[in-house]
UniProtKB/Swiss-Prot annotation:
It is found in: Nucleus; Cytoplasm, Cytoskeleton, Microtubule organizing center, Centrosome; Cytoplasm, Cytoskeleton, Spindle pole; Cytoplasm, Cytoskeleton, Spindle. Its EC number is 3.1.3.16, 3.1.3.48. Residues 7-162 are annotated as: A. Changing D493Y: In a colorectal cancer sample; somatic mutation. It comes from Homo sapiens. This is Dual specificity protein phosphatase CDC14A. The gene is CDC14A. Keywords: Cell cycle, Cell division, Cell projection, Cytoplasm, Cytoskeleton, Deafness, Disease variant, Hearing, Hydrolase, Non-syndromic deafness, Nucleus, Phosphoprotein, Protein phosphatase.
Length: 594
């Protein structure tokens, strides 16, 4: 009893006599008065190089589900609940981030209050997070930065755990399923660059432009911005009704002022969502999306880096971090001017596009054609060759290859829904779960084609199974993946290939993928006491053939006169059967007006 009291004396208190966070050397046993739990081996970050966090949005969601369930449990109602972690600096930082995020989302604490609680007690300082580059860390992202990013995302409606679909998030973030994430729901989708033909190359699944069409059309993606050199014909997107723009700059580098202006102009004049890609969809992609969010939502550089990495781990790398820090003041000024002119302009005089055309003092360029060819700017001859590594591949190539080595995640039992037969909002092509007998046979398919074992230079941290007691069916080979492969992985220029892609509920034909996968003004000094890191209503129909069912009637939430500044929700829904508190702070439905 004395030992137990001693542990709590040094613990961080989040709810008096109820919720604590502690760093312990040994694994404690729960007692009559205290319940201990840890997520150190359950929610594990998948690193690229020396990066180790923050944990992604799906893991934040799973943690909140877990903690809400414990706090609502009748058997634990009279006990103190202690989330404990070990002295491993990386695991400890991620554990602290999770309980801090919970405090911000559910306990209505400010990021500063939550961070202050983490610093209380006898806890040592926390290791800051870093980027996913190969070299030394030159930019520290603190836990406080991450909590502030969560708070900003919550305020602006970038996520809502009442409607978040964790299975969908984890499905589409995987390389074989498209490798994309929403950064601003209904506005920005970050994805890995398409290739001329869907195939597996050196163990890495590549997707043709056509593979993305059903999902893009279903979720109102109207424009595609390419930041890497041309490897597929833009005509393939434009012929399908999408606008396509080329804004090339070198892999791992920072964009010129001209590129930033043109990107902002495109985004401010585009109705609908914009899909942005470079090679891996991490560095260049995250940097330009960050510029827009800093301008229109007044995120600080640290807040937006944190938010984008929580949505899409590994984003914004090396000098790109410092670039955003330098650009923060000017982007804020541009945003203030933009909002001032938008506010003073009578709404009856025309649309936002007409207003934008008069903002000459903001140095926004003129209208761009649907297909913006870099030859006009003399930049088409630029290539990523300047930054190739000794083995002939670029930073983006390496990051994509590392990501492709990740093992499929087995979902924890608490994440499964009672309405598994319903289609996901991001993909209605998953009307059922495969039976255990089908799973058994699927495992034996041609998995040898995929390079799943980590390289000697960069070992991957594989996720461990999160199920603690219940037998959980494999998420990686459910029917959603089966059906979506017909769209995401079998689309090529070859007519025969197109014929073989199936949208049937009961099965799908064997493409290379189906065979494989059935198995402020002045930047503030950030001196914290640390050491040296979707609008989608769930579809109730169960037609599992494709990804392009019509969007739901949710868009009424968006304010019509500021559509480019408000995210809408077209896809992160979940069932009411989840273990979630229904007392989410009201700030989730409030927007901040600057």
């Amino acid at each position: 009893m004395a030992a137990e009291s001693g542990e709590l004396i040094g613990a961080c208190e989040f709810m008096k006599d109820r919720l604590y966070f502690a760093t312990l050397r040994n694994r404690p046993k729960s007692t009559v008065n205290t319940h201990y739990f840890s997520i150190d081996e359950e929610l594990v970050y998948e690193n690229f190089y020396a990066d180790f966090g923050p944990l992604n949005l799906a893991m934040v969601y799973r943690y909140c589900c877990k903690l809400n369930k414990k706090l609502k449990s009748y058997s634990l109602s009279r006990k103190k609940i202690v989330h404990y972690t070990c002295f491993d600096q990386r695991k400890r930082a991620n554990a602290a981030f999770l309980i801090g995020a919970y405090a911000v989302i559910y306990l209505k604490k400010t990021p500063e209050e939550a961070y202050r609680a983490l610093l209380s007690g006898s806890n040592p300082p926390y290791l800051p997070f870093r980027d996913a580059s190969f070299g030394n860390c030159t930019y520290n992202l603190t836990i406080l930065d991450c909590l502030q990013g969560i708070r900003k995302g919550l305020q602006h409606g970038f996520f809502d755990f009442e409607t978040f679909d964790v299975d969908e998030y984890e499905h589409y973030e995987r390389v074989e399923n498209g490798d994309f994430n929403w950064i601003v729901p209904g506005k920005f989708l970050a994805f890995s660059g398409p290739h001329p033909k869907s195939k597996i190359e050196n163990g890495y699944p590549l997707h043709a432009p056509e593979a993305y069409f059903p999902y893009f059309k279903k979720h109102n993606v109207t424009a595609v911005v390419r930041l890497n050199k041309k490897i597929y014909e833009a005509k393939r997107f434009t012929d399908a009704g999408f606008e396509h723009y080329d804004l090339f700059f070198i892999d791992g580098s920072t964009p010129s002022d001209n590129i930033v202006r043109r990107f902002l102009n495109i985004c401010e004049n585009t109705e609908g969502a914009i899909a942005v890609h470079c090679k891996a969809g991490l560095g260049r992609t995250g940097t330009l999306i960050a510029c827009y969010v800093m301008k229109h939502y007044r995120f600080t550089h640290a807040e937006i880096i944190a938010w984008i990495r929580i949505c899409r781990p590994g984003s914004i790398i090396g000098p790109q971090q410092h670039f955003l820090e330098e650009k923060q003041a000017s982007l804020w000024v541009q945003g203030d001017i933009f909002r001032s002119k938008l506010k003073n302009r009578p709404s009856s005089e025309g649309s936002i596009n007409k207003i934008l055309s008069g903002l000459d003092d903001m140095s926004i360029g003129g209208n761009l054609s649907k297909t913006q060819n870099m030859e006009r700017f003399g930049e088409d001859n630029l290539e990523d060759d300047d930054v190739e590594m000794k083995n002939g591949i670029t930073q983006g190539d390496k990051l994509r290859a590392l990501k492709s080595q990740r093992q499929p995640r087995t979902s924890p039992s608490c994440a499964f829904r009672s309405d598994d037969t319903k289609g996901h909002p991001r993909a209605v092509s998953q009307p059922f779960r495969l039976s255990s007998s089908l799973q058994g046979s699927a495992v034996t398919l041609k998995t040898s084609k995929m390079a799943l074992s980590p390289s000697a230079t960069a070992k991957r941290i594989n996720r461990t199974s999160l199920s603690s007691g219940a037998t959980v069916r494999s998420f990686s080979i459910n029917s959603r993946l089966a059906s979506s492969l017909g769209n995401l992985n079998a689309a090529t220029d070859d007519p025969e290939n197109k014929k073989t892609s199936s949208s049937s509920k009961a099965g799908f034909t064997a493409s290379p993928f189906t065979n494989l996968l059935n198995g402020s003004s002045q930047p503030t000094t950030r001196n914290y006491p640390e050491l040296n890191n979707n609008q989608y209503n769930r579809s109730s129909n169960s037609n599992g053939g494709n990804l392009n069912s019509p969007p739901g009637p949710h868009s009424a939430k968006t304010e019509e006169h500021t559509t480019i500044l408000r995210p809408s929700y077209t896809g992160l829904s979940s069932s009411s059967a989840r273990f979630l508190s229904r007392s989410i702070p009201s700030l989730q439905s409030e927007y901040v007006h600057y």
